[in-house]
């Protein structure tokens, strides 16, 4: 009996054109051992397994959809992540925190910027280390986009992908927003968001 063809969330070509599978020249053994890293190019660049990325996006969408959206904080300090995070939160209803993460945001209720949340979602655990550390102290689960060189400590659910590229981040957050809304029954299984992935993309200033 022939193996059933795997069904991707978006056509394979979309993943490839957005550079979602492109990693760095450094590699985290933890990710290698779990089969996330598919190959190494002659120039040393690590390449993610697109099927693994797609599978993790499905898992992450189911996981995030279980939480009340207003109890989910999505954070990034990476400028290319600002627009994708803001658009994601607009559609899904989560809280967006872009830019600097002020120490104590998750741990000190006496601060005016304190936020009490049930789930933290970060774009890059290396850049967003303060948020990840505070979430760990408070017992808050952490979902993270991880590149090939990303440390895995304190991350409860990893989504391997290019978490640095403008087009990659736009597509990843577009897919997640759509899939979460489908999981919540707010979109039909074959229904798309009313805007294309390009609307999630940070514009370059000339």
Curated annotation (Swiss-Prot):
Coiled-coil parts of chain: none
Superkingdom of origin organism: Archaea
Iron found in the keyword field: no
A GO MF term: structural constituent of ribosome
Keywords, alphabetical: Ribonucleoprotein, Ribosomal protein
Family annotation (InterPro entries): Ribosomal_uS2, Ribosomal_uS2_arc, Ribosomal_uS2_euk/arc, Ribosomal_uS2_flav_dom_sf
GO terms under biological process: translation
Ribonucleoprotein is among the record's keywords: yes
Matching Gene3D superfamilies: Glucose-6-phosphate isomerase like protein, domain 1
Pfam families named among the record's database cross-references: Ribosomal_S2
GO cellular component: small ribosomal subunit
Annotated family: Belongs to the universal ribosomal protein uS2 family.
NCBIfam families: uS2_euk_arch
Protein name: Small ribosomal subunit protein uS2
């Amino acid at each position: 009996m022939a193996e059933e063809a795997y069904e991707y969330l978006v056509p394979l070509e979309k993943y490839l054109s957005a550079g979602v599978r492109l990693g760095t020249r450094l590699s985290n053994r933890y990710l290698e051992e779990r089969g996330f890293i598919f190959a190494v190019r002659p120039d040393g660049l690590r390449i993610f397994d697109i099927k693994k990325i797609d599978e993790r996006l499905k898992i992450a969408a189911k996981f995030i959809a279980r939480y009340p959206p207003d109890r989910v904080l999505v954070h990034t300090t990476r400028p290319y992540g600002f627009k994708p995070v803001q658009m994601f939160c607009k559609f899904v209803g989560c809280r967006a925190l872009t830019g600097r993460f002020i120490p104590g945001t998750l741990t000190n209720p006496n601060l005016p910027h304190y936020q009490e949340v049930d789930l933290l979602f970060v774009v890059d655990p290396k850049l967003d280390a303060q948020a990840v550390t505070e979430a760990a102290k408070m017992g808050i689960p952490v979902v993270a986009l991880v590149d090939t060189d990303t440390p895995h400590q304190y991350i409860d659910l990893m989504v391997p992908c290019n978490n640095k590229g403008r087009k990659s981040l736009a597509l990843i957050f577009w897919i997640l927003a759509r899939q979460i809304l489908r999981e919540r029954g707010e979109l039909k299984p074959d229904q798309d968001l009313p805007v294309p992935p390009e609307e999630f993309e940070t514009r370059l200033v000339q």
